[in-house]
């Protein structure tokens, strides 16, 4: 088949014609380029951008991390690039000139939406009426949950300025400067939490920013000290001179007819989602460490054969954390000692964690790029094309990229939370956790210590709510505005629900992190107690089994090696609270060693001087006298910081997170003997995560990673 108009055959075969390779008019190439490099490097870039003190905007290069920084009302200040002033003025002048020339333009000389058949020459009055009728939100008392969080409002203000700076919207530069001054003075308009469908933009909430700028009597803002102020006081605090703005034709529409509230909140949500995704990868590796897992699940060949980049990177990050881990070296020795101590393969929550997390990372990363495109887009209507002298009537206000990206992100967050809950459930269950105590109980009396039982119930609650939030918002569209807005994106609603999901994932991450630190401490106790038990048993064995009553060597001395094997095979916390109890396995198994030796002793058992059976009572009596004290001394030494064997965590790449939780945040090892509750400790972690304090220790765990999996060899 011969193709025309410069087109070529698809795959060099006849049948279908496709465009010849050329520039990137459809933007697919740029979208692909944005996904190159590792996700971790992208997160590091975000963190660096978040910490910059100045956010200079000109309409085309705003990043979600910058939005998050300004939204947080920290030190980041906003500056408008002067290069945008001329083009913004040109579009504003074009609107005024076209109206004076009698040109009929939507929202300038016409009514709005389904009533755009109406006409008027009173352009300023039309803009005032637009703001008035869009002020349809409800605030309740102002303190009962009906006000959009200030962080989301600040994000919306920044994004709206950025989109208007491109000069296609017909608004004065001075209005944008005024909004920037409000941001820099930390004066935040009060916007209603609900009332937008993010199609024709976020009309209702954005109208309250316009209301403040124009000095409406019902306009309210929050001052830097948290007090409520009116428009005049807001302008005074922000240092805005010249009084309120009298809107010119198109300016009200330019302010409200955009997607900035949905995309602004989405930006702050995605900044956190990207970091929490990295945290989930690292915590999965720590989970492997404390569970004595098998690190082969991270082997690069497995993931290379699956091809998915998110999975490959997740596995490589976990592989990096586990490479050289002291826990993994110890786990390997345990496996060699007795391969039947645990299943040949770890359960899915560990073994398939890269396969589970990988697609979620890909979704979050794609959503991040989609929202970054959105916050740098011109998304109102009509668009003023000064170069061609026309107003283009379209639908860039349709916030579908926001709704879809947020639905997808929320589903990814729910999946991350589900994995975290599965890992947590294994960790606290002594049927699955390879020797750790039930509920990670850290005290001496398990009958009076139920550890993380309440935390597991809370985690189930968090996970259930998170799975509910994983349901889509965008399939609940209702036709609005006299069936003019008959399809709409629900972008802000989806962003709000995703923000809720992020909060829940933070709760789960905090709880899991505290539990992992508890498990690290329990492994430290376990190793020291086991060493003390071995030493005690060997001392008792030498004292009671080595010789007979005449001082001659006794055959029972050959039991020592088998006694040590039984100690190695037995979980410390299965007997540590009462090591000499015959209801627990340790004493039974030690006795069995002696019994088996006695059964093999033949006729010598009939002689009191050579009988092994005759030694059992003395051996057990001596153990009962010394073993409990040895175990208590070992536990006390760990608690006092004088342990004979140091904690393995200090030799691991995951140590910065442990150090952060234990030393910087001051959390403690939890036991039923103390009054400190799990909630008190995990709340310290939650507050720290909300403040971003976890970011540096998290990235420190990965500072040596070169961005590649280990070679296959």
UniProtKB/Swiss-Prot annotation:
Record's keyword annotation contains Metal-binding: no
Entry annotated with the keyword Lyase: yes
Pathway the protein contributes to: Phenylpropanoid metabolism; trans-cinnamate biosynthesis; trans-cinnamate from L-phenylalanine: step 1/1
Reactions the enzyme catalyzes: L-phenylalanine = (E)-cinnamate + NH4(+)
Residues bearing the modification 2,3-didehydroalanine (Ser): 200
Main location: cytoplasm
Family: Belongs to the PAL/histidase family.
Assembly mode: Homotetramer.
NCBIfam families from the UniProt entry: phe_am_lyase
UniProt-recorded name of the protein: Phenylalanine ammonia-lyase
UniProt organism field: Oryza sativa subsp. indica
Gene behind this protein: ZB8
